[in-house]
């Protein structure tokens, strides 16, 4: 109920025209008197209305009447600032907007003569309308300030990037050089190891061929005594039976398989020699040489 008492209290109005007349008398306006006067601003914006700035309120009424003419009282829109006869004070911009909103709300069908203060109490949505315009006007200003601050920062970062780029490129080149040198050393080590392993394998192969360390047995030629005994048996009989082969293997200290293989090789050698001798005899008889 305290708010209603504040609305209904006629003694707390901010009108100072009757007590201290400073400017010329204001001509009647097309707007209702309670909206045109500064008392509306003080009623809705009581905490924001400066108590000691009565002279500024009077000068604002004088400027609006002298700047726009004494016959009519038109209201300029205070969104961007810099209009004719408007003062760059935030409270007055709100007042000009309240004039426009009140003109739309209360003068739709024509001017209403002298409504009482209780008429404002019937419309509780009016205070919200007075508080909404400042947010809309202040947000673009803050957005522009944020953009202005971001632009120097971005330009500074753009200036720092070219200076930082050479250092990063040098660091990358040095790291690449180190990596390449490490790769080269690893390749040389691998080549040396491969060469050493190749030499080792060659020596091992020769040693294996001589010592028969691999799965294959060492090539061991027959001794003179063994070859002599086998040659005697071959002259008597080119083909051996199983019993005779076992007897010869025991006498010569060889296995049955070794004796068998030796006789096979000896027969192939004899066949080759007889073929060569036959060809030689034929050529000598016909005199081709």
Curated annotation (Swiss-Prot):
The protein's matches in Gene3D superfamilies, at most eight in alphabetical order, are given as: Homeodomain-like (1.10.10.60)
Q: Where is the composition biased (Basic and acidic residues)?
A: 187-203
Question: Where, subcellularly, is it found?
Answer: Nucleus
Alphabetical GO CC annotations of the entry are: nucleus
Give yes or no: UniProt keyword Lyase. Answer: no
GO function terms (MF aspect): DNA-binding transcription factor activity, RNA polymerase II-specific; RNA polymerase II cis-regulatory region sequence-specific DNA binding
Sorted keywords for this record are:
Developmental protein, DNA-binding, Homeobox, Nucleus, Transcription, Transcription regulation
Recorded hits in SMART domains, A to Z, give:
HOX
Which segments carry the region annotation Disordered?
103-218
Q: Where is the composition biased (Low complexity)?
A: 132-143
Q: Which residues bind DNA?
A: 215-274
Q: Where is this chain compositionally biased, Polar residues type?
A: 103-117
The transmembrane residues are none
* Function of the protein: Sequence-specific transcription factor which is part of a developmental regulatory system that provides cells with specific positional identities on the anterior-posterior axis.
**Hey, which family's this protein in?**
Belongs to the Abd-B homeobox family.
Q: Protein name, please?
A: Homeobox protein Hox-A10
- The species this protein belongs to is Morone saxatilis
């Amino acid at each position: 109920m305290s708010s209603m008492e504040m609305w209904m209290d006629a003694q707390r109005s901010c009108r100072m025209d009757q007590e201290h007349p400073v400017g010329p008398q204001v001509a009647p306006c097309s707007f209702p008197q309670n909206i045109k006067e500064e008392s509306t601003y003080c009623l809705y914006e009581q905490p924001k209305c400066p108590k000691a700035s009565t002279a500024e309120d009077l000068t604002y009424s004088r400027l609006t009447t002298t700047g726009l003419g004494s016959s009519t009282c038109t209201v300029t829109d205070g969104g961007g600032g810099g209009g004719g006869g408007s003062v760059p004070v935030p409270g007055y911009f709100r007042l000009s907007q309240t004039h426009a909103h009140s003109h739309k709300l209360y003068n739709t069908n024509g001017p209403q003569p002298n409504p009482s203060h209780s008429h404002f109490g019937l419309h509780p949505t009016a205070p919200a309308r007075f508080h909404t315009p400042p947010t809309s006007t202040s947000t673009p200003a803050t957005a522009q300030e944020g953009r202005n601050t971001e632009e120097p920062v971005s330009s500074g970062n753009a200036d720092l990037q070219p200076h930082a780029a050479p250092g990063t490129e040098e660091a990358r080149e040095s790291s690449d050089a180190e990596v390449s040198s490490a790769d080269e050393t690893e390749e040389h080590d691998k080549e040396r190891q491969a060469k050493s392993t190749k030499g080792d394998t060659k020596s091992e192969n020769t040693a294996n061929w001589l010592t028969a360390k691999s799965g294959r047995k060492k090539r061991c030629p027959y001794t003179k005594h063994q070859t002599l005994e086998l040659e005697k048996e071959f002259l008597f009989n080119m083909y051996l039976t199983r019993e005779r082969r076992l007897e010869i293997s025991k006498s010569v200290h060889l296995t049955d398989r070794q004796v068998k293989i030796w006789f096979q090789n000896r027969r192939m050698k004899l066949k080759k020699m007889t073929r060569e001798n036959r060809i030689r005899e034929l050529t000598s008889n016909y005199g081709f040489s």
